[in-house]
């Protein structure tokens, strides 16, 4: 069953469970994620980053959509950390049910403007949108770094951002970071910040 992120997270939030998100851009990884999710009867998010998107063909995404649609388990097909409107539209045209517009490194008002533009377009075709405020560093699979550049999410920005953009869910920064943590580095997770954001956030 292929659904969008808003539908999945509403159920998860109501029933207090987490949903795993797994990057899978080739068939063996994709099959592993789907088969294990089905074996556990667990909803899951299959996601692709923009840098990985073009490694697969449109035929692959058609296969992915068909496989997820025919499953008895709910799945979301999600673009992770899209940086531009064009990247998000490309994913929507390929049949993704959810996209992320990550404008967290932009000035706040520019992040709002860009995220709202994507949200308005995506909602026309039933695709959900994730936004981000606060930053978790530069995404990297090979370099140690990014972890010293965390900008924590300000709870006071959450309601304003969601109201102005209309996003369906929100990525926040509470101390985790992209990339490989340097040896000896211990992330400082601000769980009390997470609780404060949860109290005021109108979306998951």
Question: What would you call each of these model-derived segments?
Answer:
Residues 3-11, 25-51, 58-76, 81-204:
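Alpha/beta enzyme core
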